[in-house]
Amino acid sequence: MKFGIIGAGMIGHFHAKAITAMTGGTLHSVFDLRQEAADKLAHEYGAKAFSNIAEFLAESELEIVTVGTPSGAHLDPTLAALKAGKHAIVEKPLEITIPRIDELMSAAEENGKTLAAVLNRRFHPGMDAFKKAADEGRFGTLASASAYIKWYREQAYYDSAGWRGTWALDGGGALMNQSIHTVDALIYLAGPVKSVQATTVCLAHERIEVEDHCVAIIEFENGARGVIEASTCTWSKDGHPARVQLAGTDGSAFLADEAFEIWDFREEKPEDIEIKSTLMKGQEAGLGANDPTAINFHQHQRNFEEVVAAINEGRQPSTSATEARKSVEVITAIYESAQNNGKKIFV
C-alpha cells in the first residue's frame, strides 16, 4: 500500500522510518506547507514532495496518509484526505475535541475509508502480555488501575514552536500531549471510565496556556478506582518511565515503559516464567521521558502494519477512531473537572 506523509516535522520523520521498515507499505510522497521541509524528507526516502495538498492528494497511486501536524491541526488535512478517497492514520490525539473527532469519523464512514490513530504504546511484547492477562480475567476483581507519567520538558521545548502549550493547537499540556498514549493504555487494559475528578496546575514553565502537572482520580465502569498523574516538570537524570499499574483480588502487574516491575498472579501459568525472564529486565532508556526525540519507530511500524492488515481484511483496525476517541473523551473530562474546582464529571 502506498503511503503519503502529511507533516514533515519530527513526527513525520518517525513515520517515514516506520513506513520504510514495515511489511505491506512503501513511502510514495510527503506533503508539507514548507516546500523545503517536504523536499528534505522526501529526498531522504526517495519519495515525491508536495507543498500543495490538493496536488498531493490528487496522486492516483496514493492510497493512505499519515497525519503528523500539530494536534489541533489534524482536522482539515484528514478531512481532505478522506474526501479524496484516501485512508488515514492520524497521530495522537486523533483530534483535541470530541466534536472534531466525530466529524472525522462521519467523513470516514461517508467516504468508505478507514480512519485510524497512532496508538503505538499498544504495540510491544509487554503490552501484549498485559492485555492477554487482563482479557483472561487474571486480576480477579480489579480494584486499582492507575497511570503515572512523571516526565520533564525544558522551557526550550515549549519555546521551540508557537503551537506548543496552547489550547488551540496542543489541546492541553502534560496530559493531552505527553500522557495520552499511557492514558490510552490504561483504558485499553482496565476498561471504560465512568467518572473523573481532577486538579491541574502550571508549576514550572512560562509562556504556556496549559498545565504542566495534573492529578486525576478515576472511577471505572467495572468498579475499580485509580489515579492518573501527568507531568512535564518532574526531572530525573535518566527520565522516569511511564507506568501503568493494575491490581486486583487475584493478581498485580506494574508496567514501566516496556518492562514489568511486578508480574504476580495467584494462579501461575507456564507463560509467566518466560515473561519474568524476558520482560522484567529494567526499563529501557530513551522512551521520551526527558527527550521527545528519543523514541524508536518500531511501535509505529507495528501500528501501521495492523492498519494495513485491517484494510486488506475488511475489518476495523485495533487502533480505530472509535478506540482513539476514548482517551480524548477521558482527558477532556479531566480538564472539565479541573476547570470546575475538581467537580466529578461523568464520562
Which residues make up each language-model segment?
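Hydrophobic residues in well-ordered beta-strands that form the structural core
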Residues: S51, V90-E91, L115-A117, I228, ...
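Beta-strand-loop-alpha-helix segment that lines the small-molecule cofactor/substrate pocket
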Residues: I64-S71, L75-R122, G137
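C-terminal helix-rich "cap/oligomerization" subdomain common to oxidoreductases
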Residues: I64-V67, D102, K113, E221, ...
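Predominantly a Rossmann-like dinucleotide-binding segment in NAD(P)-dependent oxidoreductases
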Residues: R121-I208, N341
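Contiguous beta-strand/loop segments that form the cofactor/metal-binding neighborhood of enzyme cores
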Residues: V183-W263, Q301-E313
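C-terminal glycine/acidic-rich active-site capping loop/insertion
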Residues: F220, R243-T322, K343-V347
